[in-house]
Amino acid sequence: AERNLGQILRDDFSAYRDELLISTKAGYDMWPGPYGNWGSRKYLIASLDASLKRLGLDYVDIFYHHRMDPETPLEETMGALDSIVKSGKALYVGLSNYDGPTLERACAILNDLKCPFIINQNRYSIFDRTIEKNGLKDTARRLQRGIIAFSPLAQGMLTDRYLNGIPADSRIATDGRFLKETALTPER
């Protein structure tokens, strides 16, 4: 996807880079080995470098850390994000899939570093309103950080994609890690 977007940016939008907001994120498998996943400094910086190369860009506007890392100290992960901003490879940082208490700790670390943390990304749709129930939405408001939804169409369940069964090329049929057949009910 990043290579394709990079080609489109080069071919059609290079004159408009200052008008575009481009983001990317890291936190899941990028390559085999001990540093190909999660939230270590080595992983985050190398992941962003690879993304920038694929995109053909010098920087992104927002770089997200995709998920909390149970093995890497939060200070290391936030320090890596701060280094990325200070190096000019990202203008702002965001977090994704962080719970409320960890979001608060991360925000405090980034504030101390004077790192521009502006947004938190979470699953949010009419079918999944967890962030309203677990206090994360209120935490983000109190911390004065934005929230951006991922999967606002509930992985296609809020479209006509599954009205007539499960298409052979659908996520349920081909992957099933994130959307399972049991999620499709008469109510959904």
Q: Where do the protein language model's features map onto the residues?
A:
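A short, structured active-site edge motif that brings together acidic residues
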Residues: 17-30, 121-124
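Short, solvent-exposed loop/turn segments at secondary-structure boundaries
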Residues: 34-38, 131-132
